[in-house]
Every structure is written in structure tokens, then in C-alpha cells.
Design a protein with these regions (language model features):
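Anion (oxyanion) recognition and catalysis
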Residues: 67, 74, 215, 263-264
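Domain-scale activation on soluble regions of proteins
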Residues: 79, 91-94, 237, 261
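Short secondary-structure junction motifs
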Residues: 75-77, 81, 164-168
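Catalytic domains of carbohydrate-active enzymes, especially glycoside hydrolases
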Residues: 1-11
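Aromatic- and acidic-residue-enriched carbohydrate-binding clefts of CAZyme catalytic domains
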Residues: 12-75, 90-140, 179-198
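Residue-level detector of anion-binding/catalytic polar loops
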Residues: 2-3, 79, 220, 268
């Protein structure tokens, strides 16, 4: 059990430097008073009203610091599994990529949209468990997968520099609220193309696409229990062999069968 689950991003912040995506830390690691979130995120539950204050509300691990942490952990026989929260719990990343879009839109439109995680025309209405209304990546955008692969490749490079092998990346997958993607023209177009009738089923599309991205980069995927639940048999057949681990978190009375259901479906729990 010598594993550190490194949960470096969520709705409230992004806490790891990713070369080439400077906005993730320039914007996504800072919280404070703002009208447009172009320089920092809104304050959250624990405050964070000054984006320049040296408090827990602000800050991030530099690339060098994370590499040092990897080495330190390895010397003590601790394996670190990084998590990229997706497609939900992704508000910090989404806002950061909007800031990137606005920064480059007039001078370099291609660069502006290269890693976009949201669609300006999306009119979907939803509320997450934490009461966010804009924290889910648009899974129909090629730029979403470009973003995910970029982060995965940068993580891989950090592990290599630390003299280690990255085996898996935890992809999150939990708490995608009902109502997402229903008002997205791109998602509706994709659903029609692949024959889906319910927008929420696009979660399956996302995890199968990401499993392929991981495999292409020589990795297996991990995720919360949702990545292994409610799929078609065709999707299960693909995902079983590509999964490194499924983390069952919601096992309160009435849901305690989830662990057995997941294991019986052939996933490593």
C-alpha cells in the first residue's frame, strides 16, 4: 500500500507546473477577487481573497519540485500515482484554458483553441455536487484530448527525468452531473454520429477514448468507480485490459455492492 495518490487538480485549483500550459498555474493556482477570472480563480470555500498571498489558497509544485518529490518517494519505496481530474471536477483547468484562449485569440487563433476544454456555444445547464455550473470538459472537442495527452506526456517526462517509469495516470471520472453536454452543439453532433441517445452516455465515450490515449503512450488508466460502471459490454471488453486500478469510493449502505460488481466485471479493484 506504499502509494501516494497525487491529487494535484480539481475544481478549486491546479497545483502542478506543466510546461507549455503556463496558464494552468498562472491562473489556475491562484484565487482572489476577480470579475472575469482572467488572472485568477474566484475565492473558494477556504477563502483565498488575495491572489498574491502566500497562503494555502495559492501556489503550486514546480516541475523541479515534483521531480524531487518523485525521487524522495522512490528512495522510501513509495510509488506516486498522479490524478488528472476529468471530465468533471475540471473547473480550474477549464478556466485556465479560457484565459489562454483570450490571450492568443487575436494574435494566434490556432494556439488559442489548441487546448480548449469548453465550447462557447454550449448552453447546457447543470449543477455539480459542489454547486459548480461549469466544471465539466467538453468531451466532443479534439482539443480536450490534445490537452489530456499533453499533460500525460509532460508527467511521463517528469518521471523519466526522476529515473522512474510512469505506469498509470488516474483519470478521475467521478461525479459528472446530469445535464452536461445536452446543450453542446459539438456533443449533439457527436452523439448523432456514434448513435447515442443520452448525453450522459458520453462519459463512456470519453473513458474509452482516454484509455486509447493512455495505451498509445504506453500506460494503463486508473479512475474512480464511475469509469467501470454502466458501460456496454463492448466498452467493458476494451477497458478491462487497459485498466490498472478502479478506486471504489461511494460504498455507503445501499451502494456496498459496487466493489463486487466492479471486480466481477473483470476490473482490478
Amino acid at each position: 500500500m506504499n502509494v501516494l495518490h497525487f491529487h494535484f487538480c480539481d475544481d478549486e485549483a491546479w497545483r502542478l507546473e506543466i510546461p507549455g500550459l503556463e496558464e494552468l498555474t498562472a491562473v489556475g493556482s491562484r484565487r482572489g477577487h476577480t470579475t472575469d477570472e482572467s488572472q485568477c480563480l474566484y475565492p473558494c470555500y477556504d477563502g483565498g481573497y488575495d491572489p498574491d498571498a502566500k497562503t494555502v489558497g495559492n501556489g503550486y509544485y514546480s516541475r523541479e519540485e515534483f521531480i524531487d518529490l518523485l525521487k524522495y518517494a522512490a528512495e522510501r519505496h513509495v510509488r506516486i500515482v498522479p490524478e488528472i481530474e476529468s471530465p468533471g471536477h475540471a473547473r480550474a483547468a477549464i478556466v485556465s484554458m479560457k484565459a489562454r484562449y483570450n490571450k492568443y485569440f487575436e494574435t494566434d487563433p490556432g494556439k488559442a483553441t489548441e487546448y480548449m476544454l469548453s465550447e462557447p456555444e454550449d448552453t447546457s445547464r447543470y449543477v455539480s455536487v459542489q454547486y459548480y455550473t461549469d466544471n465539466v470538459m467538453n468531451v466532443a472537442l479534439p482539443s480536450t484530448y490534445r490537452f489530456m495527452e499533453k499533460v500525460i506526456q509532460e508527467l511521463n517526462a517528469m518521471y523519466q527525468e526522476a529515473g522512474l517509469s510512469l505506469y498509470t495516470v488516474h483519470l478521475g471520472g467521478d461525479e459528472v452531473p446530469r445535464g452536461v453536454w445536452m446543450g453542446s452543439p459539438k456533443c449533439q453532433e457527436l452523439m448523432k454520429e456514434i448513435g447515442m441517445t443520452k448525453a450522459h452516455d458520453l462519459s463512456e465515450y470519453f473513458i474509452t477514448q482516454m484509455a486509447d490515449v493512455m495505451q498509445k503512450n504506453g500506460l494503463k488508466f486508473s479512475g474512480w468507480q464511475e469509469v467501470a460502471l454502466g458501460h456496454t459490454e463492448e466498452a467493458h471488453q476494451q477497458l478491462r485490459g487497459q485498466a490498472a486500478g478502479v478506486y471504489c469510493w461511494n460504498t455507503v449502505p445501499g451502494s456496498d455492492e459496487v466493489v463486487y460488481q466492479t471486480a466481477n466485471n473483470g476490473y482490478p479493484v
